[in-house]
Amino acid sequence: MSGEWQPRTLLGRLVVEGKIKSIDEVFARNMPIREVEIIDTLLPGLKSEVLSVGFVQRQTDSGEVSQYQVTVAVGNEDGYVGVGMGKSRQIGIAIEKATRRAKLNIVPVRRGCGSWECLCGEPHSIPFKVEGKAGSVKIELIPAPKGVGLVASDVAKTVLRLAGIKDVWSRSYGETRTTHNMAKAVYEALKKTYQFYSPDQW
C-alpha cells in the first residue's frame, strides 16, 4: 500500500519513510491524523461494524433529496476505537464515507482494572469512571470486576468491544434509541480515559 499512497501531510510522509512505526508514537507526539492511509498502515487489523443505516431527506433547490445516513464504528479490540457518520444517495458510498471518518476519528483508550471489587491489575475494564455526551444522550461508564461483561445497550457494547473493553457497568440518559448519539457518547467517554491520569500514573 505504501508504494501506491502519495502522502499529503508531514505525518503521512513520516509513516511512509518508516520514521514513525506505530500508532502510539502518533498520539505521543500529538500529531493530527488527516489521511486514512496512516491508520491503514499503522493499524492493519482494524475491524469495522455498521451500527445504523437510516434514511434522511433534505430540501434543495430542485426539491427533496433522499440520502442514506450510516454510522460506523472501527477498532482493533486492543485499545483503539473510532466512530463516524457518512451520507450518500448510495448505501455503499455512505458506508465507505462513515468508515473513513471513523478511522480519522480514531483515539487511544486507556484500559485497566478500576473496580475496587477486583483489583486484578489486568486491562479488562477502564481505570476510572468516565462520562460522555452527544446530543441528548449522556452515558456513564463505570469500572466493573472481571466476569461481569459489558452491562450496556447493544450499540454501546459494540463500541466497547471494538475498543478492547471486556467488563464495564453503564448508566445512560436521554434519547438513548438514537444510535449515532449513543455511539458518539460512548466514544466521547472512552476518549477521557486517555485525557486523564489515573493514580498509578501520578
Swiss-Prot record:
Q: Which PROSITE patterns match?
A: RIBOSOMAL_S5 (PS00585), S5_DSRBD (PS50881)
- Keyword Ubl conjugation present in the record's keywords: the answer is no
Q: Which GO terms describe its biological process?
A: translation
Q: Which GO terms describe its cellular component?
A: cytosolic small ribosomal subunit
Ranges where the S5 DRBM domain occurs: 46-109
Q: So what family is this one in?
A: Belongs to the universal ribosomal protein uS5 family.
Subunit record text: Part of the 30S ribosomal subunit. Contacts protein S4.
This chain's protein is named: Small ribosomal subunit protein uS5
